[in-house]
Amino acid sequence: MASSGHSDLGEVTSEIKASERRTAVAIADLEWREMEGDDCEFHYGEGPNEAQDNDFPIEERSRLQEMLFLLGLETYQTQKLSLQDALQISSDSMKNWAPQTPKDLPWNFLRKLQALNAEARNTTMVLDLPLDTRPVEKESQMEEEIIYWDTAEDISADIYSFSELPTPDTPVNPLDLLCALLLSSDSFLQQEIVSKMSLCQFALPLILPDPENHYHTFLLWAMRGTVRTWGSQPPRVMGSFREDSMVLSRAPAFAFVRMEVSSNSKSQLLNDVLSPGHRQQDCFWHRDLNLGTNPREIADGLVEISWFLPSGREDLDIFPEPMAFLNLRGDIGSHWLQFKLLTEISSAIFILTDNISKKEYKLLSSMKGSATKYYFILSPYRGKRNTNLRFLNRLIPVLKMDHSHVLVKVSSTDSVGFVRRVRAIITHVTRSPCRRVSVEDMANAARKLGLKVDEDCEECQRAKDRMEQITRKIKDLDAYRRDELRLQGETWRKVAQVEKELCQIQWASDPPEKYRAELRHRLLELRMQQNDHDPSWGVQEFISGISSPSLGEKQYFLKWMEWGLARVAQPRPRPSPEMIFTLRPKHCGAVDFSEPFWPEPLGVEHFLREMGQFYEAESCLVEAGKLPAGQRRFAHFPGLALELLLKGLPLELIDGNTLSPALRWVTGLLKELHVRLERRSRLVVLSALGVPGTGKSTLLNTMFGLRFVTGRGRGPRGAFMQLIKVAESFSQDLGCDHILVIDSGGLIAGVRTEAGERFEREASLATLIMGLSNVTVVSLAETRNIPPAILHAFLRLEKTGHMPNYQFVHQNLHDVSALGSKPRDRRQLLDQPSDVGRATVQMEKQGDGIQTLADLAFWDPEKQHIWHIPGLWHGVPPMAAVNLAYSEAIFELKRCLLENIRNGLSNQNKNIQQLIELVRRL
């Protein structure tokens, strides 16, 4: 058996040399005969477009329309399917059902992909027939009666009818479903699909065939959102983990293709190469999987890509460095343009075939002079072996091969040893000088061959140019914040402090009027200082970008800004998570990954925060009568930001630096939302609170397909909100038109800092968010460790009588065996030690009467459920498989939340006007 660690080339060298000797002897025994017939040169098309048109015969042009009609996607060819269409809440969001017709397949795929369900690619359909029409076993109709056979009658096939459940007439190949869905989606849904597929460890579509329009599309834009983290060997104490966009990261590329017929499964071989010995991982869909042998109607010509990424542990890693693996679906002769691209970007190409004849020789001899290494994996027919050897002997000098480049795999071949040998070849290639390419490099090569690149549309390029103009001026993050984002400096912190004091004395029984007047005067002076500034050049360019009349260009610009700002930010070296867990004291609970290792990044939210401060300052002066309403310059800012919220961008509700809400800005946003939604303004507010590193944001993203920032050190420090649309057909049943989801920053898990300023701010943050919410999800690192800020908020809200529905979630981040909700752990949470409870109660000056959650008056174990969620990964990332139990548990939690909303357990749903009043009051 091969070691689960890195491949050892020396271990396999003897096998390769023995094979070389056997192959050399076989060729030497053959008498070389010159090939008969015409000249063997292969003439490539005069131009790339001509070659591309020939990739699809004319009679295949209707196949796409037939497939789209079968899947119910024909209406999305002019008006593409959007991300908002795919994410809206409907009655199907609460059902865990198998697709019954082909028209169910696209939506089933999108729902399961959003939930990171490893079964998303399964296109098996189950027909749901009425009970009276279902075939049943005859004996079941007779209960316990004895069956007597009439000897005069023959036993007919009817006795098997109970097992002959009807199956769909038209099974759909999973790759056809993927291609049809991508061709029916806009650029942003395509990007979301590819990003989720990457998280599920599925192979990603790189070149999308389009048999209707005869143009293949290189999916560069769709790949832009794919970001992965991997380790290095040997691991270093600091900086041993690297996070990068897979579009920009360079790695050796290896392509696997089929020539004519191959008895060996190319995709299965790829999976074997990428999978550790103890666990099979099906990155590439192959013939041995369900419906894998079903004929492909529109997916031939698809090129997929997947990466091997090391964990930094030699005992686990198959290869010591990242590597890209490409897979061409279909025969290279029918998809020559894709094959030619693969020869220009790959370090080595493995060609699987059963036979090499004159036709194949013509094709391959045209690659003379190629710098790529070629390897053949043969499974020859008995009567064709001599022919194969003859043509191989001619190809060896043409493709600069030697006999070690020919591998034979037949049914009797040891599969484990063969995979070990292929890995050894790949390792050998990477140890010698070889090309390393990024997806951007691949796209450049594709352009030269005439392939369409999805990123080359005018809207996308204009947005990219504007982003580059902004980010080009960012040399130092601290200096840029100080000089360009001036309203977020010390003045804003003073404003937040004054507003906090005003809020505190507002609730005092006998507020001192003189002190209140002083605070208001001080606040007005600070706001006047802010209003004296004009937006900097960078902020003005940002405003121009989101003010574009083209909705597509606006969305492209926001995406480009996210990536551009991420590239210019220079994070501090990242230690491995294991190192942090090793160094931290055991009593510290969950790790706060935000400091001291990661500085605050620069993101789109900082530009929007600057806009919010200009709006706040101007509104304050108008309210005080210091500025005529007709002279307002920034009154349109909330409308611009609202457009982004409606298109799925998280907007900041509470500033992460001061943990203070920009009241006028948030109110302005909600007023704009009320106007925009008109009659469909009934809201349910769902929030999530918890300590850092508990998977809270990932949980929300998985449950609803949201875009909250995830990852240690990058999560929100304040609170962000996103809006989910409820389908009109379901809104009456659910009782709301939209769900507003709030994701908060991490809260302190320990008790030692309770008396500090940070705890007070976090308690206020938790109180505000929970006070706005109908449903609150509390994410815990341990069942016995509830953040004191949350307990503090419980006590405050209990006075107001506002008690949302609470769901406690404990994510088992390191153990995939945690299943279900355990009564024993629920009891532990209810009866957890009273240190935190007593300390919190003492701050509220309510004595020692309340010591656990179970002592709180609002607590109802039947309504406040405790969930134990298994870990997301089954194994060690980055090559770990997604844990199916995680997806299933998240779906059950989502269904419970929606059921509680529908059944009214989440308290009275709000309209936007009521939410505005709550924000002001809290």
Swiss-Prot record:
Entry similarity comment: Belongs to the TRAFAC class dynamin-like GTPase superfamily. Very large inducible GTPase (VLIG) family.
Biological function: May be involved in cell cycle progression through the regulation of cyclin D1 expression.
Sequence positions bearing Phosphoserine: S3
Pfam families: URGCP
Keyword field contains Cytoplasm: yes
Region (Disordered): 1-20
One annotated GO molecular function: GTP binding
PROSITE patterns per UniProt: G_VLIG
Domain of life: Eukaryota
Domain VLIG-type G, chain residue ranges per copy: 680-920
Protein name: Up-regulator of cell proliferation
Main location: cytoplasm
Organism: Bos taurus
